[in-house]
């Protein structure tokens, strides 16, 4: 029997979804690995698309050679053309026209990408509209929340169809600091992340015993953790791709509690 789940707003998805993913850069390829390894219970297959020659072929070749000794089901990966991106149930937008180099170690790196990435998101949002798409349009590229709004406006999709995946890593980073600094330990069991992914993030050290000073300090650490990684000379993409991307998306498909951005009538947050 093909049962359905309802992630939001009455939107129905099959018990095992066809997922399509655009762009296999650092984030997209890492997210893809997470879905292939962990998503066998809720994903039936994954279609991948990248405009760069040889990139899709590389990841189809690599990912389909991953298999556990017990031959457990892992979602097969296949290569698709851009016009096939909206033939599935869940579309993942991981594309970016500009990712700041690791030499950029200050400022709002996420919003710096908005102009060019908005144009790119608009192209695929219009494609979704032309295809009369009925599935989920999931934004993973930065800046997540503004791109969600742009995608919804350009596509005419229902608000329940558009989701942003950026807050999961903020929660995960808060847990990281809470484990390392006892002052933030309450976050481990009582903390919550609110607001958009980026500079306007708000972390509550505890929803039961809120401390404004501690919450503000933790928020500042988490909001700028990406810059700490850049100072080490690396782009911060592994934790976002898995915490915000793969793990949060799989939780949504399983009907479980998770962090993702939804539309409140004015903004995505």
Stretches with model-predicted labels:
Residues 26, 30, 54, 115-119, ...:
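Conserved active-site and cofactor/substrate-binding residues in soluble primary-metabolism enzymes
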Residues 74-134:
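Rossmann-like NAD(P)-binding element
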Residues 1-58:
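NAD(P)+-binding Rossmann beta1-loop-alpha1 motif at the extreme N-terminus of oxidoreductases
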Residues 32, 57-60, 175, 243-251:
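Predominant activation on well-ordered alpha-helical scaffold segments within soluble catalytic domains
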Residues 40-45, 128-136, 156-159:
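Short, surface-exposed connector motifs at secondary-structure boundaries
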Residues 139-210:
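Rossmann-fold dinucleotide-binding core
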Residues 180-269:
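Long, compositionally biased stretches enriched for glycine and/or charged residues
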Residues 45, 49-88:
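Conserved N-terminal Rossmann-fold NAD(P) cofactor-binding segment
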């Amino acid at each position: 029997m093909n049962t359905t789940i309802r992630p939001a707003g009455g939107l129905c998805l099959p018990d095992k979804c066809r997922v399509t993913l655009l762009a296999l850069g650092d984030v997209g390829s890492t997210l893809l690995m997470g879905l292939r390894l962990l998503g066998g219970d809720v994903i039936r297959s994954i279609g991948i698309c990248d405009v760069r020659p040889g990139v899709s072929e590389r990841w189809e070749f690599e990912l389909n050679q991953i298999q556990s000794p017990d031959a457990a089901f892992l979602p097969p990966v296949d290569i698709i053309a851009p016009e096939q991106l909206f033939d599935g149930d869940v579309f993942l937008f991981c594309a970016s026209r500009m990712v700041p180099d690791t030499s950029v170690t200050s400022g709002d790196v996420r919003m710096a990408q908005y102009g060019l990435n908005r144009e790119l998101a608009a192209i695929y949002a219009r494609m979704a509209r032309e295809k009369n798409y009925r599935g989920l349009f999931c934004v993973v590229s930065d800046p997540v929340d503004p791109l969600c709004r742009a995608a919804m406006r350009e596509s005419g999709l229902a608000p329940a169809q558009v989701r942003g995946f950026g807050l999961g890593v903020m929660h995960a980073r808060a847990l990281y600091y809470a484990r390392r600094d006892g002052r933030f330990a309450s976050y481990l069991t009582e903390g919550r992340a609110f607001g958009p992914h980026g500079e306007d993030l708000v972390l509550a050290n505890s929803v039961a015993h809120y401390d404004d000073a501690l919450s503000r300090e933790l928020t500042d650490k988490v909001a700028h953790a990406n810059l700490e990684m850049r100072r080490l000379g690396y782009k911060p993409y592994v934790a976002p791709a898995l915490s915000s991307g793969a793990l949060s998306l799989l939780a949504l498909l399983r009907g479980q509690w998770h962090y993702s951005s939804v539309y409140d009538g004015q903004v995505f947050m």
